[in-house]
Amino acid sequence: MTDRARLRLHDTAAGVVRDFVPLRPGHVSIYLCGATVQGLPHIGHVRSGVAFDILRRWLLARGYDVAFIRNVTDIEDKILAKAAAAGRPWWEWAATHERAFTAAYDALDVLPPSAEPRATGHITQMIEMIERLIQAGHAYTGGGDVYFDVLSYPEYGQLSGHKIDDVHQGEGVAAGKRDQRDFTLWKGEKPGEPSWPTPWGRGRPGWHLECSAMARSYLGPEFDIHCGGMDLVFPHHENEIAQSRAAGDGFARYWLHNGWVTMGGEKMSKSLGNVLSMPAMLQRVRPAELRYYLGSAHYRSMLEFSETAMQDAVKAYVGLEDFLHRVRTRVGAVCPGDPTPRFAEALDDDLSVPIALAEIHHVRAEGNRALDAGDHDGALRSASAIRAMMGILGCDPLDQRWESRDETSAALAAVDVLVQAELQNREKAREQRNWALADEIRGRLKRAGIEVTDTAEGPQWSLLGGDTK
């Protein structure tokens, strides 16, 4: 499918849905803010991955060459704090949880990024960016840190709509700041923390700087689309724009933000204790069903989790799966065809997946009627179109990804990667006789539906009432 009809996307910076015109014809460059690998992933984390995987798949279906960069934040305050609390090296903590995120994305068939840079691998580029900002008069040193001078950039607030007098960075009071609205580019060295040498002394990067430097390294000074969760609009993305453009870069031309997964109207968050872990969800539903559910709402909408909504999604997915199996059994092989015009119109209209799904189920109803009437050609056309459309959404029931393996085994394999990360931390806590932490990890796993049994061969885990590994 190479027809490139007009694609319209909601640009947060413009505040409207507008025509998407790539910087280079036929090519699209995308940067997605990936995980801060401080803990295990929950479904709120992976919704962003699914939402923008659909964008990527749609662009590929339209014939575009897509460069898709998703970073890993592997050095950050929360990572350092949690690693220290667990008595583990920060780099080990980050690497362990990075593997868990990779397993979660893979379980839901989120396409691997073109590149997945880690923040710690791009310190040189970050230092170079700070040097440019200082030379341009947009950054200064103070108290061992380096800060961005917010008042030096008159366009500050263009993404979030924040008025300059209302800006609160959430960094707390710092003696080295000229103005408390300024934000940190580089943090001076502290005892027990990792640090790198710079012209301003040893230290480590600020969170906002990391993404600007990595995006530029892989996509150049200007690129098409920057994606992320809506909670990143301010201050993270606002600060990325300010520092990148102040350094002379055009940076992102479109800004897309996905809504949260909520429970009881509140954002799913570990700090609120209302998370649904990937192990728990993969115990209850198949990976393809979970992906269907996470992608079913419009990407900019909040996705309020409920058991009823989850089961409705499972029922809808199984209905499509059953239809495709009926056609294959009664008619023959079903190859992916082309999406219908209504499906294409829906995705071209700011990725309106709910309308696209309505079209898919309309085609299924037509196909069932054709099959019941003995119209095998009509049923096959419907089935082929459904395969194409569901493939773009990343959950085609007849795709080899889901058909060529036992999905239960696949889900257990993904869960095993996630659980082993926690079991490793528990074993290290036990070695250090930190029984409170070991018990806390065991309790956390149990709340996620995982029972841990200590044996002579080491800890074994099992799903409550299910399989053992």
Curated annotation (Swiss-Prot):
Keyword Aminoacyl-tRNA synthetase among UniProt keywords: yes
Coiled coil: none
Cofactor comment: Binds 1 zinc ion per subunit.
Reaction equations catalysed: tRNA(Cys) + L-cysteine + ATP = L-cysteinyl-tRNA(Cys) + AMP + diphosphate
Any Gene Ontology CC annotation: cytosol
Record EC number: 6.1.1.16
Entries under InterPro entries matching the protein: Cys-tRNA-ligase, Cys-tRNA-synt_Ia_DALR, Cys-tRNA/MSH_ligase, Rossmann-like_a/b/a_fold, tRNA-synt_1_cat_dom, tRNAsynth_Ia_anticodon-bd
GO BP annotations listed: cysteinyl-tRNA aminoacylation
Motif extent ('HIGH' region): 35-45
Cofactor: Zn(2+)
SMART domains for the chain: DALR_2
Subcellular compartments: Cytoplasm
Top enzyme category: ligase
Family listed: Belongs to the class-I aminoacyl-tRNA synthetase family.
Protein name: Cysteine--tRNA ligase
GN (gene name): cysS
